[in-house]
Amino acid sequence: MGCAGSTLRSGASFEDSRLAAIEDSRFHEVGHHAQFEDSRLAAIEDSRFHEVGHHAQFDEGGRFKQLPPANDDAKLLVADHPSLGVIRLDYDYPPALGDVDHPGSFYYDVFYRVVPGLTFELCQSGELPDDVKQRFIDAITWLDEQGVAGITGDCGFFMYFQALARSVTSKPVFMSSLCQLPAVVCAYAADEQIALFTANGESLKPMREIIKKECGVDPDDTRFVIVGCEDVPGFEAVANGDRVDVDSVVPHLVRLAEDTVAKHAGTAKPIRAILFECTELPPYSDAVRAATRLPVFDSITCCNSMLASLMDNPRFGVNNWHLSWDGAHTAHRFGDNVPPHLKGKLVNREHPENIARWNASLAERSSFSSAQQESIGRGSRKL
């Protein structure tokens, strides 16, 4: 690191000739290894770093930011806090935090669109009648028109419609967590295994051909270990459309993961990573990571990596996009955003628990003062 007032590699210097007052941090250099104790460069007092050549600076929060060159006439693209678009099945249930259908699972805004008539059974079959297919296309188009940065689905079986979805939009489309398979496979040696966890082990078998076609990966390869969660106590609530008691399921799912990893430990093909196919498995990802010390890829990591490709980096990006979002997710009810003439085509209805939650949020909002209403912004469409 350059000393106070010194010229750095690009000919840059600190305006006040010193790097001062790093809040709650003490920089230590041992040999050639240096680190910040609190893992961040924070609150540089009265210092903003400017690099003339690349127009870089430290902002007031101590974050290193890049600015476009002063003589660059190119238009600066300022993202309006990149958001995610989610295609929903015609199926409602009380989602747990961590589920794709729970907006609180994401650190960015989410727009949902239900496809009337697209039930779980239809999605699992991989075939869409012409009318449902058109509604699916219309739903992708609608999400695109909302300006979402990328699109996904709320069921792993949406892998069947990956090609259809991407033919409708130029936005990145990862309709299933399985879209991560090529990257995960590339990360490990051929003699290292990857465990694929799914809600039901048998249900993944018919998807082999579409996975090979879309991902270039053969799930029949011996490097994959297919693990079904159908016998995990408490997880049957997923199949029943009921609320899952996450706390009660965690120890059982963790035990399943530990046993799966242990079974292959010490063999010629140890398990090196886990991928959750089902969109209702991410609530358990952190517990499994902690127990197995293995990477766990799921539908949330899939969406995060997709959105990160269009996000401003909070450390050295350009636009501070993250400051343009108020942190309140756009509220969504089952069937919202479906055109009125198609609402009658919905096969399922809103889950009673979700109705109660919505009504409770309305009652809470109605108790706010006018000033408080103004402060939360965008009125009753926020939860």
UniProtKB/Swiss-Prot annotation:
<comment type="function">
    <text>Mediates cleavage of dimethylsulfoniopropionate (DMSP) into dimethyl sulfide (DMS) and acrylate. DMS is the principal form by which sulfur is transported from oceans to the atmosphere and is a key component of the ocean sulfur cycle.</text>
</comment>
<protein>
    <recommendedName>
        <fullName>Dimethylsulfoniopropionate lyase 3</fullName>
        <ecNumber>4.4.1.3</ecNumber>
    </recommendedName>
</protein>
<comment type="subunit">
    <text>Homotetramer.</text>
</comment>
<keyword id="KW-0456">Lyase</keyword>
<comment type="similarity">
    <text>Belongs to the aspartate/glutamate racemases family. ALMA1 subfamily.</text>
</comment>
<dbReference type="GO" id="GO:0047869">
    <property type="term" value="F:dimethylpropiothetin dethiomethylase activity"/>
</dbReference>
